Amino acid sequence: MWRAGSMSAELGVGCALRAVNERVQQAVARRPRDLPAIQPRLVAVSKTKPADMVIEAYGHGQRTFGENYVQELLEKASNPKILSLCPEIKWHFIGHLQKQNVNKLMAVPNLFMLETVDSVKLADKVNSSWQRKGSPERLKVMVQINTSGEESKHGLPPSETIAIVEHINAKCPNLEFVGLMTIGSFGHDLSQGPNPDFQLLLSLREELCKKLNIPADQVELSMGMSADFQHAVEVGSTNVRIGSTIFGERDYSKKPTPDKCAADVKAPLEVAQEH
């Protein structure tokens, strides 16, 4: 049984990374032939982990890292050792982003992608903030969809997918829409068939591409975490977010203050974005 955190704890970050990458490639080989031939990206989720572990993973070839909290990402990405030793690092923000934290996120060094745009207002705020930053490149963004319909999870209803992508493409010239992201429900029993949340995201991409005349290989799917990344890749994920399987179990006693208001009723369940 593949248990999140066990491989890293026993063999170290380098061996854990190799094992995860091997499992990703095995899953790619099992994909249906009709899926877009996009090589999956491994996002190593380093939340609650020290900068030295990021540097260690970077030394073993990992380049893309993800964080859930703006303050932790800003501190880690600004760490002098990371800036010096990891010049090609790419940071993904994968947590819920409140509008009051947008400017802080845009200041993160080497920010590569925001995976969790979940409203038109947030897209507009990110667009204007990125413009003020003066970057020559557009910021890559994904739209987060609440495929499971759970109130505890953030993301747009599936029915609003096309409208927000149209808005980003037409009204947010500083953003580059690159895909759809979901967390989905946890603990799906694969003996009952494919994860319905993953299947829904696949169907949303198909509908989106058809209506907006976008090639399918230009719309990524970010789905799959430590517990289900192989299945996610098998059915079409192009971006898996894996943390404890690489870095070991997390110590949440050292977790920074979440980037949210006390009034945000979804906050206590935010750690469910796990990865």
From Swiss-Prot:
GO molecular function list: pyridoxal phosphate binding
Modified residues (N6-succinyllysine): 125
Region of interest: Disordered: 251-275
PTM-bearing positions, type N6-(pyridoxal phosphate)lysine: 47
Phosphoserine: residues bearing it: 6, 226, 244
Claim: Lipid metabolism is one of the keywords in the record: no
Role according to the record: Pyridoxal 5'-phosphate (PLP)-binding protein, which may be involved in intracellular homeostatic regulation of pyridoxal 5'-phosphate (PLP), the active form of vitamin B6.
The protein's name in its UniProt record: Pyridoxal phosphate homeostasis protein
